[in-house]
Design a protein with these regions (language model features):
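Hydrophobic transmembrane alpha-helices that form the core helical bundles
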Residues: 52, 56, 64, 73-150, ...
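Transmembrane helix-loop junctions in multi-pass membrane proteins
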Residues: 46-50, 156-161, 265, 320, ...
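Membrane-interface loop-to-helix entry segments
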Residues: 141-189, 200-201, 241-245, 369-376, ...
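Helix-loop-helix junctions that connect adjacent transmembrane segments
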Residues: 12, 16-25, 61-62, 66, ...
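Membrane-interface "cap" regions at the ends of multi-pass membrane proteins
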Residues: 3, 8-51, 56-60, 73, ...
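A generic transmembrane alpha-helix motif of multi-pass inner-membrane proteins
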Residues: 366, 379-449
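Alpha-helical transmembrane segments
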Residues: 320-328, 356-357, 375-390
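TM-loop-TM module centered on a large, flexible mid-protein loop between adjacent transmembrane helices
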Residues: 94-96, 101, 133-134, 242-303, ...
């Protein structure tokens, strides 16, 4: 049976959302939407961030987890409302253009595009630490696995091969089950003595831990791309978002508490593996590694696929060099844009190898960019959403929280600012030499709260 909206629209949507393969004939259901959102948010951050946050703030890192979970409520609501009113694959760049014009749109687009390459080694490095832990390797093994994951994802995208929605959801489901099992089997080993002193590095460390954890909660913006596929966006997005929020909050807080209360000062770089070993023995470690690698492949693949199309779209609209626009049409592969992202990512890994930096060295730069994107998205929402409504007030709360998070990144915010400044400078020079093409306008959905 043909897609109810016609084959052309179905083709365009399939191109915009290659991972969305669970759309029913009548639209995306609440359960499917919740599962896809959960898969986007439960990314690679769950692999190692509990240990990084605990190292930064000790048991007080639990306060940072609670704060980020609370922040997710207005943040997810804001992006869901934007997506329902302005369904388009451009995401925050589209909202920035509608609210503030081409310059801001290009700036946020450049910051996000370039950060995908710089941040990819962080995501791949999380899985690399699990590989090194499983085989008894060290730094060289970690870096090799990190580069291998980036190369494999690049190869998959180069030939247009995409991970299907069902496989990606299966991976997310496996991770959710693994987290729940990890907490359940490790809690009998909890020692409340590990919760004292509660704030060994002072309360200011909670803020630093929170800035790290932004990575774990990146992904709510994917709602803006999924919104056009819901059967009834105004009704169903709220329901699916609520389900995803509850599941994410319970799983993240559970694994964070187990990391602190069970492992204490013995927390290693792969706490999920350590928790399972406590419950099932050494045989559980390889299973965790396989799931971690699969999850990382899915997450990095999604960012590379989306990032390469973002670069091509920006180039098409005059926001990046036109040479990157090749392959950006429906059914095509934006190989030039993909090659730029892959080159940045592998170059970053090479720099880490030569300088002795760890694979999470660019983590705060990446989280700074996510915070920057959220600031722009929330600010755009204040202009695009009906003033005084619940979603508008959520945008207010999101903007305040995102500004705080952006400030907590400290000097690391310089990275996205420089990226954005480069985009602005390029656009100004380009406008002086040749006129910019007219951007493609997104479709306008019906009114929503």
């Amino acid at each position: 049976m043909a897609h109810p909206a016609g084959p052309e629209l179905a083709g365009r949507r399939a191109t915009r959302l290659p991972y969305l393969l669970l759309v029913t004939r009548t639209g995306l259901s609440v359960a499917q939407g919740a599962a896809l959102t959960l898969g986007a948010v439960l990314g690679t951050g769950v692999i190692s961030l509990p240990a990084l946050a605990a190292a930064e703030a000790g048991p007080a890192s639990l306060v940072a987890w609670l704060a980020l979970i609370a922040l997710s409520v207005p943040l997810a609501t804001t992006f869901a409302s934007l997506g329902a009113r302005h369904p388009d694959g451009g995401g925050v760049s589209t909202y920035a253009r509608l609210a503030f014009g081409e310059h801001v749109s290009t700036m946020v687009g450049w910051a996000f595009y370039l950060t995908i390459g710089v941040g990819a080694p962080v995501a791949a490095g999380f899985a690399g630490s699990y590989v090194a832990d499983a085989v008894g390797g060290g730094r060289a093994t970690n870096l090799t696995a990190t580069a291998g994951i980036i190369a494999l994802v690049t190869l998959l995208n180069w030939f247009g091969i995409r991970i299907s929605g069902r496989v990606q959801l299966g991976i997310a489901g496996a991770i959710a089950l693994l987290l729940a099992v990890s907490v359940a089997v490790s809690l009998p080993h909890a020692d409340l003595g590990n919760l004292t002193p509660f704030a060994p590095h002072g309360w200011s460390a909670v803020g630093r831990a929170a800035s790290l954890l932004v990575w774990a909660f990146a992904g709510w913006e994917i709602l803006t791309s999924l919104s056009a596929e819901y059967h009834d966006p105004a009704r169903d997005i709220r329901r699916s978002t609520t389900i995803a929020l509850v599941v994410v909050g319970v799983l993240y807080l559970g694994i964070a508490f187990a990391t602190v209360a069970v492992l204490g000062s013995d927390t290693g770089p792969a706490p999920l593996s350590d928790l399972l070993v406590l419950g099932f023995g050494g045989g559980a470690r390889p299973v965790t590694t396989v799931v971690a690698v699969l999850l990382t492949l899915g997450a990095v693949n999604a960012y590379f696929a989306g990032g390469s199309r973002l670069g091509a779209a920006l180039a098409r609209d005059g926001g990046m060099p036109h040479v990157l626009a090749a392959g950006g049409g429906p059914g095509e592969v934006p190989r030039r844009s993909l090659a730029v992202i892959a080159g940045i990512a592998l170059g970053t890994v090479g720099t880490m190898a030569a300088s002795g930096l760890s694979t999470d060295a660019t983590l705060l730069l990446a989280t700074g960019t996510f915070s920057f994107v959220y600031v722009v998205g929330a600010a755009a929402a204040l202009r695009l959403l009906p003033r005084g409504t619940a979603s508008w007030w959520c945008a207010v709360a999101s903007l305040v929280a995102a500004l705080v998070l952006l400030g907590l990144t400290g000097t690391h915010v310089v990275g996205p600012i420089l990226f954005a400044g480069a985009g602005l400078a390029w656009t100004v020079v380009k406008r002086r030499t040749s006129p910019l093409p007219a951007p493609v306008e997104p479709a306008r959905a019906g009114s929503c709260p």
